[in-house]
């Protein structure tokens, strides 16, 4: 089972993940209206890209935007989870062993203590996000079973992996559960809200280009005929 999950199934999961996310990016770009978007973006690409990068970077800094500062609890929860969600899967030593075995390369590995800390903080962040969905009326009434499914899919690889790391119960069982839930995440990501892995950058980039080109950002230089 382990050989299958870290061999053919891993290849298939990564193919779906990267292929699906690439398709989402292509569909997003093709969905732009040439009369409203492309006609402005192409002639003013340089200033548009500058606005796109600035827009994305501001939202990647904790409390870097007004909206983050207005929701401190959610901001802390969001960054606790997402920092771990990026760093642990990519730089965990155990993951890089598999990368080296299956693909012939590896990334720098986090110290085990750092990886453990990031994992615990990521789980705490997910618990905080879940509590927010329960406690805030305006969030609770919009929450559906689909949202809980996304939270569960996001949490499962961290929880199962950490239980395996601590050798709670049967190690092999938790290890297989960790691999299965991790590959489930990869497979469902392109087809769910988890596609924000790339669509966040697309949407923030589009808004940044809009503000830089169309909505007054360009007044710092020569006026554009918009």
Swiss-Prot record:
Keyword annotations of the record: Cell membrane, Heme, Iron, Membrane, Metal-binding, Transmembrane, Transmembrane helix
Cellular compartment(s): Cell membrane
Cellular component GO terms, alphabetical: plasma membrane
Bilayer topology term: Multi-pass membrane protein
Cofactor(s) of this protein: heme b
GO molecular function, one term: metal ion binding
Membrane-traversing stretches: 1-23, 46-57, 73-99, 112-131, 141-164, 194-222
Function: HMWC (high-molecular-weight cytochrome c), ORF2, ORF3, ORF4, ORF5 and ORF6 in the HMC operon form a transmembrane protein complex that allows electron flow from the periplasmic hydrogenase to the cytoplasmic enzymes that catalyze reduction of sulfates.
Entry-linked NCBIfam families: sulf_resp_HmcE
Protein name: Protein DVU_0532
Organism of derivation: Nitratidesulfovibrio vulgaris (strain ATCC 29579 / DSM 644 / CCUG 34227 / NCIMB 8303 / VKM B-1760 / Hildenborough) (Desulfovibrio vulgaris)
């Amino acid at each position: 089972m382990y050989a299958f999950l870290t061999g053919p199934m891993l290849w298939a999961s990564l193919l779906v993940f990267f292929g699906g996310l690439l398709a989402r990016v292509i569909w997003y770009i093709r969905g732009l209206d040439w009369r409203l978007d492309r006609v402005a973006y192409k002639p003013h690409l340089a200033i548009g890209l500058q606005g796109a990068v600035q827009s994305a970077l501001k939202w990647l800094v904790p409390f870097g935007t007004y909206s983050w500062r207005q929701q401190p609890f959610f901001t802390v929860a969001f960054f606790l989870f997402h920092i771990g969600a990026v760093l642990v899967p990519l730089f965990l030593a155990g993951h890089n062993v598999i990368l080296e075995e299956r693909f012939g390369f590896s990334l720098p590995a986090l110290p085990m203590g750092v990886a453990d800390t990031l994992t615990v903080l990521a789980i705490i962040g997910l618990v905080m996000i879940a509590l927010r969905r329960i406690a805030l009326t305006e969030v609770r009434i919009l929450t559906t079973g689909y949202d809980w499914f996304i939270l569960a899919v996001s949490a499962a690889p961290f929880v199962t992996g950490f239980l395996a790391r601590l050798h709670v119960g049967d190690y092999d069982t938790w290890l297989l559960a960790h691999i299965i839930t991790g590959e489930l995440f990869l497979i469902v990501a392109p087809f769910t809200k988890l596609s924000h892995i790339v669509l966040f950058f697309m949407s923030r980039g589009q808004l940044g280009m809009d503000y830089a080109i169309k909505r007054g950002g360009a007044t710092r230089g020569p006026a554009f005929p918009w």
